[in-house]
Amino acid sequence: MRLIPLTTAEQVGKWAARHIVNRINAFKPTADRPFVLGLPTGGTPMTTYKALVEMHKAGQVSFKHVVTFNMDEYVGLPKEHPESYYSFMHRNFFDHVDIPAENINLLNGNAPDIEAECRQYEEKIRSYGKIHLFMGGVGNDGHIAFNEPASSLASRTRIKTLTHDTRVANSRFFDNDVNQVPKYALTVGVGTLLDAEEVMILVLGSQKALALQAAVEGCVNHMWTISCLQLHPKAIMVCDEPSTMELKVKTLRYFNELEAENIKGL
């Protein structure tokens, strides 16, 4: 596992965007051989999306031959609702870059057959071979996507019940009214994430410090689903300074030394 210790959320966003752009450009995608990118929503990736849009407008990257799969979507929320992940992704990213509409894959939380929707999503991912880079965030309780504590580490795309804590955390997007936050969501599974060639998790804020500690210094434990990344051959944690407050000093010093050359120029 790599840990990229930065100072601010803005630096995390810039580093992550630069990494994505470098991966896409090195891959040299074509219509027949697209780069497959997994994407999250929420507050954490906002600076990354902003930086990606800026880099696209500067001519540093094209998304014409990029295929995307989003991590999750609320169940029962109309896709036109401003807080649906369909709306979020178009508002903050898709509408500002040159990605073709047919290359965008989002779970349908209003599908008449939820099990079939989840199964078809997995099948479509497999049809591309694999996701080359999956970017994500992490919840205060260590959940990735909507794989809440005690999720199976072999799980696939499915419907999940959201914990009260997750709904409270997300209520900031719903006028701070937890009753407006859906109780269920469709989410890729832990196993789906582990199938990706590379997984990059962004970690921001002191409230995520225990989750980061569990991921880096703890044992693999389904109560902290983020810890599954210890099993992944190519996992990256990109974090700001407040999120590292629970790590041991020697742990942080170790990663600072390892990544010194990779965190310059931000």
UniProtKB/Swiss-Prot annotation:
GO biological process: carbohydrate metabolic process; glucosamine catabolic process; N-acetylglucosamine catabolic process; N-acetylneuraminate catabolic process
Known function: Catalyzes the reversible isomerization-deamination of glucosamine 6-phosphate (GlcN6P) to form fructose 6-phosphate (Fru6P) and ammonium ion.
SUPFAM superfamilies from the UniProt entry: NagB/RpiA/CoA transferase-like (SSF100950)
Keyword Nucleotidyltransferase belongs to the record: no
Keyword annotations from UniProtKB, A to Z: Allosteric enzyme, Carbohydrate metabolism, Disulfide bond, Hydrolase
EC top class named in words: hydrolase
Quaternary structure note: Homohexamer; trimer of disulfide-linked dimers.
Gene responsible for this protein: nagB
UniProt similarity note: Belongs to the glucosamine/galactosamine-6-phosphate isomerase family. NagB subfamily.
Annotated control of activity: Allosterically activated by N-acetylglucosamine 6-phosphate (GlcNAc6P).
Recorded GO MF terms: glucosamine-6-phosphate deaminase activity; identical protein binding
Cellular-component GO terms for this entry: cytosol
Domain of life of the native organism: Bacteria
Protein name as annotated: Glucosamine-6-phosphate deaminase
Stored InterPro entries: Glc/Gal-6P_isomerase, Glucosamine6P_isomerase, Glucosamine6P_isomerase_CS, NagB/RpiA_transferase-like
Keyword Disulfide bond: yes
Gene3D superfamilies for the chain: 3.40.50.1360
Residues at the catalytic site: 72 (proton acceptor), 141 (for ring-opening step), 143 (proton acceptor), 148 (for ring-opening step)
Enzyme Commission numbers on file: 3.5.99.6
